[in-house]
């Protein structure tokens, strides 16, 4: 008879795994924040600022990661992260990037950080730059899905 692991046991196993990972890696958070990210090139009708984190949300994410055991570096815009990653003063292989930054207004704005991570061989959480850009292009995504018999 197969042994079933309870949801609580699975959560505990994931938590223990995260603790082990925190011993090897640090987290870099690249996020847009409503109080710390300047975005002068915003859309007027559909502001990208609606997707920015509040200070409270930002702090909750950071505190959760730190409570697990991760050291966390914080960047509130892409430019500061670009300066850090392109002029490394330390080993970049010890980092995992958690990205939710999107300061720009063009279609590829969410693929910038994953592209740089790929260029500098830095691990990151989330989709690769191609998938991010493809999924942001609703027309092309819809065409691909229709080609495979999936209606949109």
What does each model-identified segment do?
Residues 1-123, 130, 134-136, 140:
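ATP-binding N-terminal substructure of ATP-dependent carboxylate-amine bond-forming enzymes
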Residues 137-152:
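Short, glycine-/small-residue-rich phosphate/pyrophosphate-handling segment
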């Amino acid at each position: 008879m197969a042994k079933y692991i309870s949801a609580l046991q699975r959560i505990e196993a994931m938590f223990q795994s995260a603790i082990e990972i925190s011993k090897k890696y640090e987290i870099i958070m690249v996020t847009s924040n409503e109080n710390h990210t300047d975005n002068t090139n915003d859309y007027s009708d559909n502001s990208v600022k609606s997707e920015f984190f509040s200070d409270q949300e930002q702090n909750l994410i950071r505190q959760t990661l730190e409570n697990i055991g991760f050291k966390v570096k914080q960047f509130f815009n892409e430019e500061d992260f670009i300066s850090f990653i392109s002029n490394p003063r330390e080993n970049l292989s010890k980092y995992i990037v958690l990205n939710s930054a999107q300061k720009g207004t063009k279609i590829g704005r969410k693929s910038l950080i994953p592209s740089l991570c790929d260029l500098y061989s830095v691990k990151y959480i989330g989709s690769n730059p191609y998938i991010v850009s493809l999924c942001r292009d609703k027309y092309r995504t819809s065409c691909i899905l229709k080609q495979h018999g999936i209606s949109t």
